[in-house]
């Protein structure tokens, strides 16, 4: 029974995309990604009574150049939706919204699995910035320092046409150094790119 269901799903999936799809062509490309990110913010980061959610709706736009079927380089801008802290410093009514954004520079090695499916990894650096500190009773909360951090991730792409791939990806910005550095982020996304050739 399970085998029949699996076969039907694979059959439907295989015909959901154009039959003549083939690998992306080398050249410049633009990429848009949407998804959710774990900002690893906690109410305790601001001694707050609560936060709305540490999971943030997130978007990323990027431009890159694919040298061949195995290597690309990418630069991107990521914007995380705000995390709202309520009762900062344990004081009711002392609220603040924290916004985070990042600029990244990534090498992107790729492994073709078939003519139109690729596994890829990303490795590089990201500049992470946060705005939204608050001073309550003389104490500064969420006064994060902007910082350069390592960034890495993995993904799977499918070429709908040679010019238009879709992808699923996970990207992490790894906070280093401790202190008042912004916590790490984990971004889970679906994306669509366009290759100019």
Segments the model singles out, each with a brief description of its role:
Residues 24-27, 36-42, 59-136, 158-160, ...:
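Gram-negative (and chloroplast) outer-membrane scaffold detector with strong preference
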Residues 45-47:
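Short, basic, glycine/proline-bearing loop/turn elements
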Residues 129-176:
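A generic hydrophobic-segment detector
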Residues 42-43, 176-178:
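A short, acidic/glycine-rich surface segment
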Residues 13, 22, 53, 65, ...:
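Generic marker of residues within folded, mature protein domains
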Residues 1-27, 197:
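Cleavable N-terminal export/targeting peptides
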